[in-house]
Design a protein with these regions (language model features):
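Positively charged n-region of N-terminal signal peptides that target proteins for export
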Residues: 1-6
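Bacterial N-terminal signal peptides
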Residues: 8-18
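Flexible coil segments in periplasmic/lumen-exposed cytochrome c-class electron-transfer proteins
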Residues: 91-136
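Gly/Gly-Pro-rich "capping" loops immediately C-terminal to redox-active cysteine motifs
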Residues: 31-34, 54-87
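Electrostatic cytochrome c docking/interface patches
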Residues: 21-40
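The canonical Cys-X-X-Cys-His
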Residues: 37, 41-51, 102, 106
Length: 136
């Protein structure tokens, strides 16, 4: 019986470790991109989406109202919308770098950690990474 309890405990601990690892969002942008993105967002997006991404004339870009798991959003889908349709009235008018940086800022504000590899325009367009806000 004791061996069974130990085995069960070990199995349960393994499952919890796997679940915790799966719940950690990937690091797909750099801190420098998110910093630059905050400035680019403030200049080009905040007037519609709010200074804190809370929404206004445009939808919120942070939290569960934006990216709940049930929405099935991906980084690629959101980046494509961002880079092809924004800013409103001037779609596609920013540089690739500005779009990359704004996406990094949105990811940061939604609880995604920064990493050592920069998000790139071409990679972001087809990125199938689920976008689920870690902000409740």
């Amino acid at each position: 019986m004791t061996k069974m309890k130990i085995a069960t405990f070990g199995f349960t601990a393994s499952l919890l470790a796997v679940a915790a690892q799966a719940a950690t969002p990937p690091a797909i942008y750099t801190a420098a991109q998110a910093t630059a993105g905050a400035s680019a967002f403030s200049q080009n997006c905040a007037m519609c989406h709010g200074a804190n991404l809370e929404g206004g004339a445009g939808p919120a870009l942070v939290g569960q109202a934006f990216a709940a798991a049930s929405n099935n959003y991906t980084v690629g889908a959101i980046f494509t919308e961002l880079s092809q349709q924004m800013p409103a009235g001037q779609p596609g008018s920013l540089t690739h770098t500005q779009y990359e940086d704004i996406m990094a800022y949105i990811l940061k504000q939604n609880g995604y950690p920064a990493g050592t590899t920069a998000i790139s325009y071409d990679k972001a367009m087809g990125d199938s990474t689920p976008l689920v806000s870690q902000v409740k």
